């Protein structure tokens, strides 16, 4: 079973420059990455930057399987102001093109957050974005994978999956968010549309993004569900180093993470 690691693993602690961090991912046994840099910024990659990142990934001996889309607190998929939603649209188009250029097949996006009792205005507002990027996604072979983020996300995910075909819209499962929100049972029903994975552990309280078995997630249940789903890509881990939890250096954290990952994928499934 092949595995993948998120590219922003050290962005919030050691801040290792791109070329070096890609190299050490490969040195510790990873062959695949999920691109998660700039996931919460308004950075638009230039064609020169896209070519550079693509070359760095290839030179490191890695393959990018999918890309995290980007947004900010105001530049959202359901932004009420057209100018802000247009900015979101530009960012999403940029990441779709980037994903295609680096060899990925899916861009992960966050659904709108419920604002008030009625969810439908935000969901309907977001449809403008899907309609605008659909042709680009189809031309480049990119799927939009809706990530579970909040307790009410099953409603949003169902809304999008019912409205659009699997070639265009799929599901990104985030184990940490599901554990905090207590909605894994509801999310299991989306296994047929599983297109991307954000696997990481926590203790049910904070979004700690730690390796398997660090927290209290039932990893055997998750592995069984993934194997029963239609997911066919490398298993991706959205693990990020936090010096509050691990005092060693980057190499030691990668060794610890890879050991936990190997334990996870080797779990016996009844």
Model-identified regions with their sequence ranges:
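Hydrophobic residues within beta-strands of alpha/beta enzymes
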Residues: 33-34, 65-67, 107, 171, ...
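Acidic (Asp/Glu)-rich catalytic clusters
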Residues: 21-27, 45-67, 94-103, 134-139, ...
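Glycine-rich, proline-tolerant flexible connector loops at the mouths of alpha/beta enzymes
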Residues: 34-57, 111-117
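Charged helix-capping and loop-helix junction motifs
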Residues: 46-52, 85, 89-92, 120-130, ...
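N-terminal small/glycine-rich loop or linker at the start of catalytic domains
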Residues: 1-8, 66-78
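Active-site-proximal loop/turn and secondary-structure-junction residues that shape catalytic pockets
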Residues: 9-11, 37-39, 71-73, 111-115, ...
């Amino acid at each position: 079973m092949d595995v993948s690691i998120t590219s922003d693993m050290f962005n919030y602690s050691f801040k290792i420059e791109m070329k070096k961090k890609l190299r050490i991912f490969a040195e510790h046994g990873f062959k695949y990455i999920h691109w998660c840099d700039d996931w919460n910024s308004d950075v638009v990659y230039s064609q020169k930057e896209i070519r550079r990142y693509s070359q760095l990934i290839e030179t490191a001996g890695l393959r990018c399987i999918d890309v995290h889309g980007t947004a900010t607190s105001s530049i959202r998929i359901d932004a009420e102001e057209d100018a802000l939603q247009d900015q979101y649209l530009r960012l999403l188009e940029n990441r779709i093109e980037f994903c295609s250029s680096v060899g990925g097949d899916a861009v992960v996006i966050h659904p709108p957050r419920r604002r008030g009792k009625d969810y439908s205005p935000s969901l309907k507002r977001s449809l403008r974005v899907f309609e605008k990027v659909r042709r680009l996604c189809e031309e480049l072979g990119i799927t939009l994978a809706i990530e579970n983020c909040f307790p009410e996300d099953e409603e949003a995910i169902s809304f999008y999956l019912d409205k659009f075909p699997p070639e265009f819209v799929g599901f990104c499962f985030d184990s940490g968010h599901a554990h905090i929100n207590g909605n894994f049972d509801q999310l299991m029903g989306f296994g047929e549309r599983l297109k991307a994975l954000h696997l990481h552990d926590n203790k049910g309280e904070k979004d700690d993004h730690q390796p398997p078995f660090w927290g209290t997630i039932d990893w055997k249940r998750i592995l069984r569900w993934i194997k029963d789903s239609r997911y066919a890509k490398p298993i991706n881990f959205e693990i990020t180093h936090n010096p509050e939890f691990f005092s060693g250096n980057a190499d030691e954290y990668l060794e610890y993470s890879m050991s936990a990952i190997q334990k996870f994928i080797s779990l016996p499934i009844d």
